[in-house]
């Protein structure tokens, strides 16, 4: 469910805007997407895990808010990110 530090470093290296970038919206969305995908796989096996389902919904909402922020302020970066991540919209 949780990302290992190695997985997180890989995600950051793929989506960073500059060398020390760990907090840009692109990186945050990419990390959340990895966590969401991992948790989705967990929930396929453990259908009754409602606590994790609530966490998943919170993460999806947080990702949506970050994507809305990026869409409103930097539309080109937003389009590039959704294409790269393969998200709908």
UniProtKB/Swiss-Prot annotation:
Lineage: Bacteria, Bacillati, Bacillota, Clostridia, Eubacteriales
Keyword field: Ribonucleoprotein, Ribosomal protein, RNA-binding, rRNA-binding
One of the GO BP terms on file: translation
Protein name in the entry: Small ribosomal subunit protein uS15
Subunit structure: Part of the 30S ribosomal subunit. Forms a bridge to the 50S subunit in the 70S ribosome, contacting the 23S rRNA.
CDD domains for this protein: Ribosomal_S15p_S13e (cd00353)
Record-linked NCBIfam families: S15_bact
InterPro entries: Ribosomal_uS15, Ribosomal_uS15_bac-type, uS15_NS1_RNA-bd_sf
HAMAP family documented for this protein: Ribosomal_uS15_B
Record's function text: One of the primary rRNA binding proteins, it binds directly to 16S rRNA where it helps nucleate assembly of the platform of the 30S subunit by binding and bridging several RNA helices of the 16S rRNA.
Gene Ontology cellular component list: cytosolic small ribosomal subunit
Gene Ontology MF term list: rRNA binding; structural constituent of ribosome
Family: Belongs to the universal ribosomal protein uS15 family.
């Amino acid at each position: 469910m949780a990302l290992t530090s190695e997985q997180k470093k890989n995600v950051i290296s793929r989506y960073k805007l500059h060398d020390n970038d760990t907090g840009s919206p692109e990186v945050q969305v990419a990390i959340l997407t990895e966590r969401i995908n991992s948790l989705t796989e967990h929930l396929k096996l453990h259908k009754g895990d409602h606590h994790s389902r609530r966490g998943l919904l919170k993460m999806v909402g947080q990702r949506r808010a970050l994507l809305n922020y990026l869409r409103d302020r930097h539309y080109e970066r937003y389009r590039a990110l959704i294409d790269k991540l393969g998200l709908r919209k």
